[in-house]
Amino acid sequence: MMSTPAISVESLEKYFPPARSGWRALLQPLARPTELALAGISFAVERGEAVAIVGSNGAGKSTLLRILATLILPTRGRASIAECDVERHPSRARYQLGYHTGGDEGFYTRLSVRENLGFFAAMNNMSRAEAQARLALTAERMGIARELDRQVRTLSTGMTHRVGLARALLHQPAVLLLDEPTRSLDPLAAADFRRLLKDDLVRQHGTTLLFASHTLSEVEQIADRVLLLEAGRITAFDSPRGLCAATRATTLEDAITRLARRTAPVQSQL
């Protein structure tokens, strides 16, 4: 009997209203959305699998992750996290996932790192003892143990990024969604974090990982499969080795370049 996928996406579409200015902006709510971000894509990620989303800027990578993270709604279609529909049951879905992007972290910048993470732990209904134990473990893993009592506003960009990653991991989510996971990290810290993702979270703890990345060496190191998005459509979904074999390429970079040049998208199957 096949297990239920950790992430399921069915005929997912997302349109955004076109940008307008002046008097046209007054009619914005009445305008039919015309800018396509996702064009009815379907795919599934199995439990304990690591999948990388790869594509050019504007391909729909961040939009897909934001829908799965319950931050924006799809126009049509369905998406589920651990069998929880992200549109119908967003609170249940959020409990199953961790999400991090290198953008705005949404921290209380005048509070300490410890206070920020403690607040997040309380939002996830952790007891004080459980929160302290998980905070200590996660802080050590992410290399922020010495920064716990510093105000967030005093941290460097790279350190703030680490704190954001720690927050995403704090409640030990079943599904982890990451947008450019090693952005702003120095090479050594990035290598350590990649090992944490693949060896600790995915292999040892069975965490399901879906991440967007432009760094193909990172994709090769972490991903079991690669989902290639172009103009909101899935053009390929296979293992790095499978992509190379299908395109007769010797490297993943060559394979993705050849696939990106194809004009006819191929819809993946669940």
Protein language model regions, located:
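Conserved ABC ATPase "signature" region
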Residues: 23, 118, 122, 129-147
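Helix-to-loop junction immediately C-terminal to a conserved catalytic motif
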Residues: 69
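Catalytic Walker B motif of ABC-type/P-loop ATPase nucleotide-binding domains
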Residues: 176-180
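ABC ATPase "signature
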Residues: 237-238
